[in-house]
């Protein structure tokens, strides 16, 4: 039983959870269009509604339920303060996904996945430190005076190279709590690395995918921009709600601590006044 099944069995329903996707919106976005029937993966059979003109049609009722389950789990991860890494290196998804990840302050990979990005994170972290050091150097007022034109050019090239490969995870100081991938086939290496480290994987699975390769599958068209953006918008809204809840909890804790500190101070002041008053009585006896 996968993590998704556990959440389904628990029947997670959060009053602050985003609403379920609308069937009509998914139809309009073309989320239901799968691949040619000859390219299908038999393991997707439970998510296929029918065949039409040689193309498999995805059961959108299943999409809605799976998306809700995945979104509820992602919301809880965000609420706990942990990081969710978005992975989308496909041309039609990379720009939109990177924009959404930036809005959420979540790490993302939209260029080539570097082998060992998760399983050899200690090495990746060294590269991130180098990137940070180069950025700090370039921001110094004496940068042009301290380095020759040739040195600055070399450092600029190094920085650009690192920025392109690792810019999306530049603030990541530890392995993420979860991955969200747009196409499990296209991001196979990322999925494999996550599985080795027992990191739960969420993602879009088309009719040519193996839904069992990840923990929270969302049956959907992973090739169309409108389909990808619709699913990304939905899970992003859930993550944003989780972050909002986290900030609310932190604020409630802050207010509670201030109240307790104020009450403690008032109590100590009252005790001190009582002690002073008692001492005065002793003196006057």
Model feature map: region roles:
Residues 14-251:
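Ribosome large-subunit tunnel/peptidyl-transferase-proximal elements
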Residues 1-7, 179:
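Short, small-residue-biased leader/transition segments that mark boundaries at the very start
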Residues 5-24, 241-285:
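Intrinsically disordered, compositionally biased charged tails
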């Amino acid at each position: 039983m996968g993590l998704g099944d556990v959440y389904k069995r628990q029947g997670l329903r959060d009053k602050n959870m985003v609403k379920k996707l609308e069937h009509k919106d998914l139809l309009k976005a073309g989320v239901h269009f799968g691949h040619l029937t000859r390219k299908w993966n038999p393991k997707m059979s439970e998510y296929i509604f029918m065949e039409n003109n040689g193309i498999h049609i995805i059961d959108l009722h299943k999409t809605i339920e799976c998306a809700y389950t995945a979104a509820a789990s992602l919301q809880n991860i965000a609420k706990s303060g942990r990081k969710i890494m978005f992975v989308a290196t496909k041309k039609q998804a990379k720009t939109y996904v990177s924009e959404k990840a930036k809005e959420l302050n979540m790490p993302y990979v939209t260029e080539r996945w570097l082998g060992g990005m998760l399983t050899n994170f200690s090495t990746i972290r060294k590269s991130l430190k180098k990137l940070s050091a180069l950025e700090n150097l370039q921001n110094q007022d004496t940068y042009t005076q301290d380095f020759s034109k040739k040195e600055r050019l070399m450092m600029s090239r190094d920085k650009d190279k690192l920025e392109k490969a690792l810019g999306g995870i530049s603030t990541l100081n530890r392995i993420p709590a979860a991955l969200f991938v747009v196409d499990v086939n296209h991001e196979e290496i990322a999925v494999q690395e996550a599985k080795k480290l027992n990191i739960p994987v969420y993602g879009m699975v088309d009719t040519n995918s193996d839904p069992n390769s990840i923990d929270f599958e969302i049956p959907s068209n992973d090739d169309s921009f409108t389909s990808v953006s619709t699913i990304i918008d939905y899970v992003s809204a859930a993550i944003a709600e989780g972050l909002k809840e986290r900030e609310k909890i932190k604020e409630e804790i802050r207010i509670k601590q201030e109240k307790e500190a104020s009450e403690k101070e008032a109590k100590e002041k009252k005790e001190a006044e009582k002690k002073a008053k008692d001492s005065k009585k002793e003196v006057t006896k």
